[in-house]
């Protein structure tokens, strides 16, 4: 089996980001993004998705975290697409429900080649520490556009915003793991009746 690894670098006037991933890893991760709460969430994706990740980012955090968070989503999406290659043999679809105390979220993903995001999370507050919860949408939109996936995110219940988004990221990691897994019965076969994704 060919290694499903990738390294992507993104350099703009706003951010400089390097992302290395191994889709068939063990969940080892290192993050230096300058946005601690995002690091915490990305760690959930790595651990629950069993994806090795190494992301280093320098952004215009003196303005705010918007560009950094969005561009990390973009770069991670590009890295996943690059590591995945032609998509032959993958399960393609993934889904997961994850609880954390009172919070429960569902994430469903399709490596369809058609970017689309449906994110429905009614946060109970606008900030988690110093992190603006609006930026989670920007992260996932960046990922979706560049990984070329359809992604449905629903927080079904929750009172604590930290718990709400942590269940989302854990479920995202587990849905990724399921969708990216190689199906031995589909070896070398495109998971689409069209013959292309």
Swiss-Prot record:
Gene3D superfamilies: Imidazole glycerol phosphate dehydratase, domain 1. It comes from the Bacteria. The keyword Transport does not apply. GO terms for biological process: L-histidine biosynthetic process. GO terms for cellular component: cytoplasm. It is found in: Cytoplasm. Its main location: cytoplasm. It catalyses: D-erythro-1-(imidazol-4-yl)glycerol 3-phosphate = 3-(imidazol-4-yl)-2-oxopropyl phosphate + H2O. GO terms for molecular function: imidazoleglycerol-phosphate dehydratase activity. Its EC number is 4.2.1.19. Keywords: Amino-acid biosynthesis, Cytoplasm, Histidine biosynthesis, Lyase. Pathway: Amino-acid biosynthesis; L-histidine biosynthesis; L-histidine from 5-phospho-alpha-D-ribose 1-diphosphate: step 6/9. NCBIfam families: PRK00951.1-1 (NF002106), PRK00951.1-5 (NF002109), PRK00951.2-1 (NF002111), PRK00951.2-4 (NF002114). Belongs to the imidazoleglycerol-phosphate dehydratase family. This is Imidazoleglycerol-phosphate dehydratase. It comes from Hahella chejuensis (strain KCTC 2396).
